Design a protein with these regions (language model features):
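A contiguous, surface-exposed recognition patch within enzymatic or periplasmic domains that forms
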Residues: 30
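Acidic/polar-rich alpha-helix caps and helix-coil junctions
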Residues: 1-5, 33-225
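His/Glu-based metal-binding/catalytic segments typifying zinc-dependent metallopeptidases
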Residues: 1-27
């Protein structure tokens, strides 16, 4: 099992302090509608947030609250979970994307099966006819965008986004217009982040310890010293 959230109990305050790995950008928050069963499970709205000493109110990831079977007592949360290596919802997403890649007019059926299972209305082909321009300037079909958005909702904060972008041949640009923008603006390294498709930064560097111990590795991955 694994712990997705760093957490601790603050007895003087009578509340938990937890530190999610991610801050959702505004375009992610907008993906979640009120009718979506996942909205109140995956997101914590109106959360009191502290970033580098600056305090504010915003939206946080709250997807992994913890498996009760891993609790050591009834009062202390440990936020521990059994990682799901593969879920049935991923099969619907894979099916939708695979059908679309074989035929750009296909893929709507498995997409709608997942959407309706999550409380969303089914889409018609007329809903996804128009091309969509992404934040990084990439233009894709409306259907492929709907498939990507559904994957973004279902797989939120599960570590698949990097691999999705590589598979789709897309870059990304940080959307600084987040619910936490006033706090993010005070932390310079959080303000800008842009990588084009095919950037060497999509591949992690080889750890220095591995390079030192095994000279057969040769040179470091492109883009790293």
């Amino acid at each position: 099992f694994g712990s997705y959230l760093n957490s601790s109990w603050k007895p003087n305050l009578g509340e938990y302090f937890y530190a999610p790995t991610y801050i959702p950008e505004q375009h992610i928050v907008k993906l979640f509608k009120d009718a979506d069963f996942r909205t109140d499970i995956f997101l914590v709205k109106n959360a009191n947030v502290t970033i580098s000493g600056s305090k504010g109110v915003g939206v946080l990831i709250g997807k992994f609250r913890g498996n009760k079977n891993f609790q050591t007592n009834t009062t202390t949360l440990v936020y521990r979970n059994r990682p799901k290596m593969f879920r049935i919802s991923q099969m619907y997403l894979v099916d939708a994307e695979a059908q679309y890649r074989l035929d750009p007019s296909k893929g709507l059926d498995p997409l709608n099966q997942l959407r309706t299972a999550r409380g969303l209305a089914a889409l018609a082909m007329s809903d996804v006819e128009k091309d969509v321009t992404l934040l990084d300037g990439t233009k894709i079909s409306g259907l492929f965008n709907a498939i990507q958005e559904e994957r973004g909702r279902e797989m939120l904060a599960e570590g698949t986004r990097l691999f999705d972008l590589k598979r789709w041949g897309q870059g990304f640009q940080r959307d600084v217009n987040t619910s936490l923008a006033p706090l993010v603006d005070k932390v310079s390294y959080l303000q800008t982040m842009k990588q084009t498709a095919g950037s060497p930064k999509f591949v992690w560097p080889i750890p220095n310890s591995e390079m030192t111990q095994n000279p057969n590795f040769g040179s470091q991955n492109q883009g790293y010293l």
